[in-house]
Amino acid sequence: MAEAAFHPPRRKRRVFECYQAPFPVGPGAGDFRMCRADMVNNCVVVRSPEDMDQLYNKGYFGKGILSRSRPVYSISDPSLVSKWQGANLNVPIITSKKYQQRVQWAKSALQEQGFDGCSVTKILENYTRPLEFPFLEKGGAEQTGDSCDTVCPNTENTELSGQSSTDTGNIATSSPECQKEVCQKAYAEGDPASDSMVGSKEQEPADVKETAQTSCQMHGSCMHCGCKAKGAPDRESCNMAKSRERAPEYVLVQEEEESSLCPEEGSAREQENFVKKEKLVCRRNPFRIFEYLQLSLEEAFFLVYALGCLTVYYGEEPLTILKLWEIFSEVKPSFKTTYMAYHYFRSKGWVPKVGLKYGTDLLLYRKGPPFYHASYSVIAELVDDNFEGSLRRPLSWMSLSGLNRTTVNASKELLLCYLIKPSDMTEEEMATPECLKRIKVQELIVTRWVSSRERSEQDDL
């Protein structure tokens, strides 16, 4: 057997963040934080923004359900955010067309719940009416009347011109309070029928000022998440997370209105004097989509068993380590094998991620996906002392060659991880995670043998 040649990990050219910590646990007792996750539809999800930030930034555990990796989903239109960036806004900005689309989604959701057309129309009219605009940053708290209106004459030969306006009517309108019965009916944004992650208990939305004045550094200045300050008890954090899910989300809708620059009537160029004036109107989002941090079963069990910084709940009942081992093994028959490999490589300092994209069990990153490309694609197999047993993935020479080619073309190396269990290990021992103490690991790196290269090396010798 030839000796393996190890290649250093390839660092990414553009890195936009700093490395914080390998694990979400600190050296001191004051830095420790117990996070919470929920078992939903055989998946483990984290709902609290603070827990999501803790688990992803320190160890890169999980991924956002609406994002490629980091949970940074926002409904804001990027072009509108850059256009209105001088207004110091901290709530999402969307177009009128996108808002009407969400109104239609909310209408369909309410009709599916049994409401008639008249009731649905009345509910949505009350729920989506314009509100007062209290969501400015601290730097612009005294400038509630400022706006960045774009004035566009309704003619083809006129250029766009931007001008500043101090008219408070451009953004602010009436400020009615959220009526209890309307909010309870118009719960398309937090209703279990439209969001399976939200619980079944109804709760009155929180006050506008209490939820809107909190800004989260993780989500940026253009996204309202309502994250609470650090240092609060876990129970209070859970209650605030639930109330935040049921509280309304406020958005700024860019709308157009026509106005006349020349008040004289009977003018020959009256049509040219009408302009389209863009303004931001604050409204409730009738159909809210939540993003959560989804953990793989291996990541969730590692956080519970190895680090002890996560508690997984099923409903309101916390699950024990033995119960999680049993449930995860039923949900995923190969869980024991893949977790053994995950635990081994995590302990070695690698950041394992799901390798489904390349047809393997795991991908190994140094530090994390934002800093380095994946170095290895791992296939894990559980065998006995004689390297015998029922393999999860019997590989023929053709399939092994194809898998290796796929891995090499992505600038990675194929690694076979054999988890060797003693011959005297019983099924009772395998039923608990204590079996990890008796497992041995052997790694094999697969390389393609090239005959011409071998001949040239022999000739050189």
From Swiss-Prot:
Its EC number is 4.6.1.16. Residues 201-210 have a biased composition (Basic and acidic residues). The keyword Lyase applies. Residues 140-176, 190-210 are annotated as: Disordered. It catalyses: pretRNA = a 3'-half-tRNA molecule with a 5'-OH end + a 5'-half-tRNA molecule with a 2',3'-cyclic phosphate end + an intron with a 2',3'-cyclic phosphate and a 5'-hydroxyl terminus. One of its GO terms (biological process) is tRNA processing. Constitutes one of the two catalytic subunit of the tRNA-splicing endonuclease complex, a complex responsible for identification and cleavage of the splice sites in pre-tRNA. It cleaves pre-tRNA at the 5'- and 3'-splice sites to release the intron. The products are an intron and two tRNA half-molecules bearing 2',3'-cyclic phosphate and 5'-OH termini. There are no conserved sequences at the splice sites, but the intron is invariably located at the same site in the gene, placing the splice sites an invariant distance from the constant structural features of the tRNA body. Belongs to the tRNA-intron endonuclease family. This is tRNA-splicing endonuclease subunit Sen2. It comes from Gallus gallus. The lineage of its organism: Eukaryota, Metazoa, Chordata, Craniata, Vertebrata.
